[in-house]
Amino acid sequence: MLLAIDVRNTHTVVGLLSGSKEHAKVVQQWRIRTESEVTADELALIIDGLIGDDSERLAGAAALSTVPSVLHEVRIMLDQYWPSVPHVLIEPGVRTGIPLLVDNPKEVGADRIVNCLAAFHKFGQAAIVVDFGSSICVDVVSAKGEFLGGAIAPGVQVSSDAAAARSAALRRVELARPRSVVGKNTVECMQAGVVFGFAGLVDGLVGRMRQDVEEFSGDLGNRVAVVATGHTAPLLLPELHTVDHYDRHLTLHGLRLVFERNREAQRGRLKTAR
């Protein structure tokens, strides 16, 4: 059993995966709030409570974090509470198996890397990955499995909350599809702006990427998998015209792939690269 921990700015996903390679599957997944000042002891208490008896069956652990302070605590937690369980933390220097063809590879978020890795392994072809998190990341992986870069936009919930916070006439609304793109009240107007506006944003970015990436021109452009993931993806999927696939567990499988690559490359206890 593999413990996978995906820490983002607002929420953390904890997953348990069984099997390996093409036989791997996510058997449990939980979503909890991310606390930037959480301690290793608190993390251990939460995660041990979630996984229960499966704690004794862990054969490995893999984690990423877009919050550096939390990644430090995850490392301490794994060392102290599961010292016999080999683990990999996704950070600069660790073997991911995906070349980063960008100006500064160290700046690329671990979540973006493992998503593209998972998409390439799942579809075996060039792909565009759309991750709907606190930010919307639209990233490109080539037919050779290379990370080519991407675009980052404000997330759906973050944008909606910011609009409400900075306007006296607007309030925080439930993220839901309105009756029509033409809202009949303030709530519906905000929902229409969020749902249809962000769907147009994503479709626009994907379309421009298909045009701008030389590899995607001509017949090859028809062999580009476009996959969505992330907590708010299901809200927008019905309105998206460019997305072909949805994978709720894409990031967890990316973590698994990095763990397996490092397990095969090293003997004994796995360590993160320094």
Curated annotation (Swiss-Prot):
Q: What is its EC number?
A: 2.7.1.33
Which pathway does this chain act in?
Cofactor biosynthesis; coenzyme A biosynthesis; CoA from (R)-pantothenate: step 1/5
UniProt lists the gene as coaX
**One of the protein's GO biological processes:** coenzyme A biosynthetic process
Q: Does the keyword Nucleus apply?
A: no
According to UniProt, the name of this protein is: Type III pantothenate kinase
Q: Give the CC-aspect GO terms.
A: cytoplasm
Q: Where is the active site?
A: 111
**InterPro entries xrefs:** ATPase_NBD (IPR043129), Type_III_PanK (IPR004619)
Identify the keywords attached in UniProt to this record, alphabetized: ATP-binding, Coenzyme A biosynthesis, Cytoplasm, Kinase, Metal-binding, Nucleotide-binding, Potassium, Transferase
Q: Which GO terms describe its molecular function?
A: ATP binding; metal ion binding; pantothenate kinase activity
Q: Where does K(+) bind?
A: 131
Q: What function is annotated for this protein? A: Catalyzes the phosphorylation of pantothenate (Pan), the first step in CoA biosynthesis.
Report the subcellular localization: Cytoplasm
Reaction(s) the record says it catalyses: (R)-pantothenate + ATP = (R)-4'-phosphopantothenate + ADP + H(+)
- Coarsely, its chief localization is cytoplasm
Q: Which family does it belong to?
A: Belongs to the type III pantothenate kinase family.
**Residues bound to substrate:** 109-112, 186
